[in-house]
Amino acid sequence: MKYWLTSFIILLGLLLFSQEKRASDSYFDLNYFSGNIALHNNDILHLITGHPEGIILSWNKKTFGNEAWEQRFNYPDYGVSFIYQDLKNNVLGNNYGLYAHYNFYFLKRNLTLRVGQGIAYNTNPYDKLENHKNIAFGTHLLSSTYAMLNYKKERLFDRFGLQIGLSLIHYSNANVKAPNTSVNTMALNMGLNYNIDEEDSEYNENLNDDKFTERIKYNIAFRSGFNQSDIIGSGQFPFYILSAYADKRLSHVSAIQLGVDVFFSNFLKELIYYQSVSFPEENVSGDEDYKRVGLFAGHELFINKMSIETQLGYYIYYPFDFEGRTYMRIGLKRYFGNKFFGAITLKSHGAKAEAVEFGIGVRI
């Protein structure tokens, strides 16, 4: 009941805030959700004690084809979201998250897919004295991603509409600090949407999408950050990655990549030493090299000045065994002009995250 009361108060405030004359081409939506924590790792079984619930409050800006990319992606929305989640376990605590998101439309704009990325705050992370059972979250600040698939109807009652659907919310600190088994919530959501304007603007349908390609371009990127092995208390260490790759633009929205990564992962120095003295049966001498080299192929999906980058790699130089020879990378890239870019990416081995990477680069 308290979630519905909170939701009503928030929505009432938004209605009062939205009483303006000029067109804003935006709307608010408010969803209540309830679901289950997915058992992706048996180690978190003791943390699953109830059905998590919470609210998702969002502001959304509509697009009407004023720019070519808006028409190519069927007039998506973009906006910001706030998520409050009660994980129904005192050990886990509660999460508060702030996200940027896109909404993509299908089936005559009745079906929406939202993808959001942001930062969440956990109220009760791991502490070796006060909260040693919380092996899901090793830090207050978490990386969080959520996806929402809704059947939505707008303007059913004046400016009010309804939506119902499914949500997936992921929380992890990406091995910035151990422990980090993470939490995934699968939930059913339902809620209201409210359009600020009395009526929508007209859609532009003047796209002349001629074939577009570019010659092969060459990229150099530098990525860095901090991470830790799975050994609690082993310490956080900086890492550095140099990447060189070629890309071929296939269309306005798509490009393919082929390149090489060189990894300088300082946390492996500590892990190599730890295994050499603690687990002699694993035949680790302590002199193994902490560096790795990988070859990768990738794809880039362009959305305005942003892009979604996905890569699959294989270590060709792999002197110390850590999580297997294949790796993946997914993240967001932002272009500044035609040559320079910044990126935030997640590197993982299957479902096991290794690091959040912050990168800069040049394309020539």
Feature-to-residue mapping (PLM):
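Repeated loop/turn-to-beta-strand initiation elements of outer-membrane beta-barrel proteins
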Residues: 66-68, 109-111, 155-162, 198-201, ...
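Transmembrane beta-strands of outer-membrane beta-barrel pores
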Residues: 32-38, 61-63, 82-88, 117-123, ...
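Residue-level signature of outer-membrane beta-barrel architecture
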Residues: 61-63, 104-106, 151-155, 194-196, ...
